[in-house]
């Protein structure tokens, strides 16, 4: 019985890495999605509407990044987002862009599209380099 338990634990150790984490296929799919988002976002509104999807891709990519890459993008994202609080506590969703649900003036649109372009180029750079 003891050897069967040991064998079972060993098998789980071998199989568990295959079932968890951010796989190469996930990374490739996100890379293609970032390229597609950047290519298809031609006007300001589509860029602004795509910001949250870029942030979601970054969240999935986050564990596989080096500490320097994380810090660089985190500083950039934190500078342009607000933390969402529910009863004074951060919500499960985390952070939202400062300009996502506001009536956008031309100046705010410029900031939002600049954020989209910079975040998109940073994410694309992670996938290519």
Curated annotation (Swiss-Prot):
Keyword tags: Immunity, Innate immunity, Secreted, Signal
Domain of life: Eukaryota
Subcellular location: Secreted
A single Gene Ontology CC term: extracellular space
InterPro entries per the UniProt record, alphabetical: Turandot
GO annotation, biological process: cellular response to heat; innate immune response; response to bacterium; response to heat; response to UV
Chief localization: secreted
Signal peptide span: 1-21
Role of this protein: A humoral factor that may play a role in stress tolerance.
Similarity comment: family membership: Belongs to the Turandot family.
Protein name: Protein Turandot B1
The organism of origin for this protein: Drosophila erecta (Fruit fly)
